[in-house]
Amino acid sequence: MAVVSLSEMMEAGAHFGHQTRRWNPKMSRYIYSARNGVHIIDLVKTAVCMNSAYKWTRGAARSGKRFLFVGTKKQASEVVAQEAIRCGASYVNQRWLGGMLTNWTTMKARIDRLKDLERMESSGAIAMRPKKEGAVLRRELERLQKYLGGLKGMRRLPDVVVLVDQRRETNAVLEARKLDIPLVSMLDTNCDPDLCEIPIPCNDDAVRSVQLVLGRLADAINEGRHGPNE
């Protein structure tokens, strides 16, 4: 049985690519045609890729792999957090900070600082500080929560990165590849399929398309960890 149907993808607008002048020729194998100056993605091939991605992701989850969802564009941000939380993955959905993977020791120290500040806030320790000092600590807490809140459960580097919008998340791609962390990537027609291990050709700008793909990948992770009936 297919992981996702052609009608579901059509309804989500997953077949709409970018303007033909903005394409990457390496994506030609996944393009069906062009209409009104816009490339149309071959959803039959997308369905095949989704099946492969689902099976691969489920297998990785079954073997205990840890996942990091990355997508910082406005229309993907909420979905990234929602689906990552649903399957117990970590996530980055506001801004990719340089060194999040390649400078993990420093990043982990900042995550630990976030946890310390949250403990101080919940215990009332910040409220007991002088007003000015308390305000400084709360601003630091808010900033760390915004950018690192999705990483609090990540005690070490992820085994797999799930990516929305390869072009926007260039630094995340480079860091993952430098560390040989496999990438499961949504690929629009302006992307490079050679820069990921598990490609999913589809519209990475439409919220419904992002929701559909990440939702299925989250399902795969949950199935791998808990079984299909849990």
Curated annotation (Swiss-Prot):
Pfam families: Ribosomal_S2 (PF00318). It comes from the Bacteria. Keywords: Ribonucleoprotein, Ribosomal protein. GO terms for molecular function: structural constituent of ribosome. The keyword Ribosomal protein applies. One of its GO terms (biological process) is translation. SUPFAM superfamilies: Ribosomal protein S2. GO terms for cellular component: cytosolic small ribosomal subunit. Gene3D superfamilies: Glucose-6-phosphate isomerase like protein, domain 1 (3.40.50.10490), Helix hairpin bin (1.10.287.610). This is Small ribosomal subunit protein uS2. It comes from Prochlorococcus marinus (strain NATL2A).
